[in-house]
Amino acid sequence: MTVYEGLKNKYPESDIVYTDGYDLATNELHLMDARNAAMQSDVVIVAVGERFENSGEAKSRADINIHPNHQLLVKELKKTGKNVVVLLMGGRPMIFNEMTPHADAILLTWWLGTEAGNAIADVLAGDYNPSGKLPMTFPAHVGQLPIYYNYKNTGRPETKEIGYSCRYQDIDFEPAY
């Protein structure tokens, strides 16, 4: 369920306009379409962040800034004079300081499940209050992130211990001590 589908479900009588916006590849036509759609709207809801395949195990990055094209998109949409609500999607803390002054509201959505669109629409409609504490710290700058040298990389195959098995067995193991 996409955010667009969730909003259509929540507001079936409303005219909700969707455009591709501005993806990670530079495409001025998409940016122009997003600007034109924003000019015809009462409020702008823009989803930015990272792709779902870029977060998770063995997906470490040295630069966790929001992609410059996404920052530009939010900045350009704010120039329309409309209220801009940013949906920040990702699976890790990200740096979005440059985007913050151009957003009237930012909702951190993480990567939700199959009902993400309905859940996000419920929050945007005020039917649910997204209260609570962040489960991790969001740095203000990349320089605040610890960078380790000469540590074992993530994503290596796990080492199987002696006696390890992926099935049930009737084998007695002697203690190692």
PLM features: residue spans?
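Functional beta-strand-loop-alpha-helix junction segments that form "active/interaction loops"
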Residues: 1-37
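Surface-exposed amphipathic alpha-helices with a cationic face
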Residues: 8, 74-81
